[in-house]
């Protein structure tokens, strides 16, 4: 991976910039690239918000699929017959599908399983995928702290927070938000954290609520 400064130096007007898993400029790692390049592609599955990346050369936006990884897998699978992905890429895409579907429990359709089947045929190892979600001891303790601080309001909404700052705090709070949905009668969860003077919020819900 490269940082924003390096990307800005390397990006030119005809550079292809691909934005995945968001359609909002301020949610990208380096919004400046969207101003430099004339070739922007957006691939996303979230409901359209007020802020939207305009002037794209390709917009692939479907809110009824499980994940952006499912969409990328479909592109790879159907655009060209001779496209092959390596084992690591297949495992990364399968991990993304597993994460967004809570291990194929939510927002899972026929296309989701077809994508997973293709990734498995491409060499994805489910044990290696599981290992991608393993936490180190510090992150594990932080997640436990979040769950310990959780409060249920209105009988079905769970709120939690942590004051601990870690490098992977956005991943930790996402995993904690998923865990909180396992509490009986909880339909939605919100977890807050702070890092580098920025506040991160991870929201999760069951099918009846929008997250």
Predicted regions and their residues:
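Hydrophobic helix-and-loop "lid/oligomerization" segment in the mid-to-C-terminal part
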Residues: 1, 8-15, 94, 102-211
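Short helix/loop capping segments that flank catalytic or ligand/cofactor-binding pockets
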Residues: 27-29, 51, 106-107, 170
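Short alpha-helices
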Residues: 45-116
